């Protein structure tokens, strides 16, 4: 049975309040963000690149290359681990990682194998 555990930062309440204050969730596409994801895909040689924001229940894609969905349940988000630290979070092979090997995005389309994420941090230090 897949592990559908949410990873919660100790400052989650404050982090969510900060995220809401930006009024960016569910906003329209913006060329500036799309250029970043397109460039990341080219530089990293990966088929997928995302700018994601995590609210209480979901991972929402502000910008995306290589996927046709706009959000996932937070429990499936690799990014929930990314926001737990202030540095690069990397998974070499998701099929071998206990946290992700049963994730439906690893066992099925888009068949994620490698993941690298870096937290977006605001001026107050919230990821």
Predicted regions, residues:
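A short, aliphatic-rich beta-strand micro-motif
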Residues: 113-124
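Charged/polar positions on well-ordered alpha helices
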Residues: 42-43, 84, 119
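Intrinsically disordered, low-complexity terminal regulatory regions
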Residues: 1-74
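Regulatory sensory and allosteric helical modules in signal-transduction proteins
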Residues: 17-18, 47-48, 54-64, 69-113
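Structured loop/turn residues at beta-strand edges in well-structured enzyme cores
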Residues: 44, 110, 126
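A generic "structured core" feature
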Residues: 41, 78, 122-126
């Amino acid at each position: 049975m897949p592990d559908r555990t949410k990873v919660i930062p100790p400052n989650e309440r404050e982090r969510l309040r900060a995220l809401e204050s930006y009024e960016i969730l569910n906003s329209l596409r913006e060329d500036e963000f799309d250029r970043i994801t397109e460039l990341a895909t080219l530089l990293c040689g990966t088929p997928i690149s995302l700018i994601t924001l995590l609210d209480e229940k979901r991972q929402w894609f502000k910008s995306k290359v290589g996927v046709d969905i706009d959000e996932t349940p937070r429990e499936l988000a690799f990014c929930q681990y990314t926001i737990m630290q202030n540095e690069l979070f990397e998974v070499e092979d998701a099929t071998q990682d206990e946290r992700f090997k049963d994730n439906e995005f690893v066992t099925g389309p888009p068949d994620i194998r490698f993941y690298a994420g870096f937290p977006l941090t605001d001026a107050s230090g919230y990821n």
